[in-house]
Amino acid sequence: MPTTNEADERMRKFKNKGKDTAELRRRRVEVSVELRKAKKDEQILKRRNVCFPEELILSPEKNAMQSIQVPQLSLEEIVQGMNSGDNENELRSTQAARKMLSKERNPPLNDIIEAGLIPKLVEFLSYHNNSTLQFEAAWALTNIASGTSDQTKSVVDGGAIPAFISLISSPHLHISEQAVWALGNIAGDGPLYRDALISCNVIPPLLTLVNPQTPLGYLRNITWTLSNLCRNKNPYPPMSAVLQILPVLTQLMLHEDKDILSDTCWAMSYLTDGSNDRIDVVVKTGLVERLIQLMYSPELSILTPSLRTVGNIVTGTDKQTQAAIDAGVLSVLPQLLRHQKPSIQKEAAWALSNIAAGPAPQIQQMITCGLLSPLVDLLKKGDFKAQKEAVWAVTNYTSGGTVEQVVQLVQCGVLEPLLNLLTIKDSKTILVILDAISNIFLAAEKLGEQEKLCLLVEELGGLEKIEALQTHDNRMVYHAALALIEKYFSGEEADEMNALEPEVGNDAYTFQVPNMQKESFKF
C-alpha cells in the first residue's frame, strides 16, 4: 500500500474535471530513494568484473589471450609489494589484490580500502610503460567502485576520475574498456558523481568509441556507461550533456544486439522521466516509432524499458501523446495489457491511464484500437498493482470522455469489476473508483438514465459495497460514499427506482418505463 505522501502526490497529479491540462497527466512516483539492486527486468546500476579459477588475461604486448598464474598473497604482503618500488613486485601484488577483489562472493573491498591501497592503484593507472600493471590496477578499482556509495567515494576521492577518463584513449583496447567499465560504476552511484564525470568532460571521448570497428562486447560496456550518464534525477543530467549523447543513442537504437538495445532503451527512459521539455528532446529525434517497434519484442529486457519510455512520453502534452498514438502505441497496448508478466500489464495500464487523460479524440482512438475490452479484463482478473493502474485509466477516461464514450465503456462491462474493487484496503484507490462511479452517474444523468444506472449498480452488489464504505476509517472515503448515496440512492430517487423495479420476463429482466421508449436506454 502506498505511503500517504506517495498517494497524495499521485492524487495531486491526477486528472480532475476543470483542472489545467498540465495537471491532467500523472508522473511515475518513485517510492525508493535507495540504490536498487539488479533485478531481472531492471537495469543494473553497477557491475563487478569477476574472475574464474582458470584465468585468461589479454596480454597487451602479445595481443593474445594468455593463461596466467596469480600469486596468493596476504594483505600485508600485497601492501608491501605495491609500495616496494620494484616493477615485478608491484605487478604481482596488484594482481593478487585484483584477484581478491574479483572473488564471486564477499570480496574484501573494505580491507583493501582500509589498507590505504587506492592512491597506489590510481597511481598505477598512469604507468603507460607498463600496460599490464595499468590493466590490473584498473580492474581492481573497477571492482571497488562497484560496491557501496562509500566504497565508490573512496575511489573518487583517490583521484580516479581524471585518471580513468585519460585511459579511455589508451591504445590498448582492454585497458580502455576497463576504464569505461569503471566510469560506468562511478556514474551509476548517483547524480553527484554522474555530474562530476560530465564536468570532467567524459562524454566526448566516450562518443568517439561508438563506431563500426568497436568490438561488440566493448560496445555493450560503452552503451551501459552512457545510459548511467543519463540516469538519476534530483538533479537531472544537464541538458547540454543530454544533447551531446542523444545523437549516438539514436544510432544505437538501430543496433540488433539485445543488450545494446536494452541499455539504450533504459537511457531513453531516464531522459523522458522529467519535464515536458525533456520529453520533447526525445520525441524530436523521431525515435518514437522505433520505441514502439521494440514494444513488440519477446525479450523482456527490451520490452520493459521501451514500454517505460513510451509511458513517460504520454505523461507529456497532448501533442507529445499524439506523437506516440500516431506511431502506433494503441495497437501494441492490447497485447501488453494481457501479457503474462504482471509488471508489463501494470506498465501498459499506466501508459493507457495517461492516454485516457487526454481529450475526447484521443479517447476515441483508444476505443477504435479495441482497448476497452482488455482494460475491463484487467480490472476483472489482473494483478492488483495492474488493477490499480486500470482504475486510474477508467477514472481518467470517464473524466474526459464524452457521454457516448462513457456509455461504450459501461457497455463493455466496466461497472462490475469496478464495484468489486471497492472492498480493497487501499483508501486512495477506493476514492479513485468512487470518482469514476460519480463520473458514470453524471453521464447517465445527461441521458436521463440515472434510475436505470441505480438499478444496475444495486443488481451488481454495488450499493451494498458503497453503503459499507460509510463506516470506513478514512474520512474522505466516508464522505465520497455518503455523497453518492445521498445524491442517487435516497429520497425521490429511491421512490423512482422502486417504480422501475424490474419484472422477471421469460428470459430477461424487463423494466416498467412510463412515458419513455425502451430503445432510448443505452446502459
Curated annotation (Swiss-Prot):
Any one GO biological process: NLS-bearing protein import into nucleus
Keywords: Cytoplasm, Protein transport, Repeat, Transport
Domain of life: Eukaryota
Signal peptide range in chain numbering: none
Function: It is essential for selective protein import into nucleus. Promotes signal-dependent binding of karyophilic proteins to the nuclear envelope.
Molecular functions (GO terms): nuclear import signal receptor activity; nuclear localization sequence binding
Subcellular location: Cytoplasm
ARM repeat ranges, renumbered to this chain: 109-151, 152-196, 197-235, 236-280, 281-320, 321-362, 363-402, 403-447
Biased composition (Basic and acidic residues): 7-22
Domain IBB: 2-57
Region (Disordered): 1-22
Subunit structure comment from the entry: Forms a complex with importin subunit beta-1.
Record keyword Cell cycle present: no
The protein's name: Importin subunit alpha-1
Gene3D superfamilies with a match to the protein in the record: Importin-alpha, importin-beta-binding domain, Leucine-rich Repeat Variant
Any matching Pfam family: IBB
Protein family: Belongs to the importin alpha family.
GO cellular component: cytoplasm; nucleus
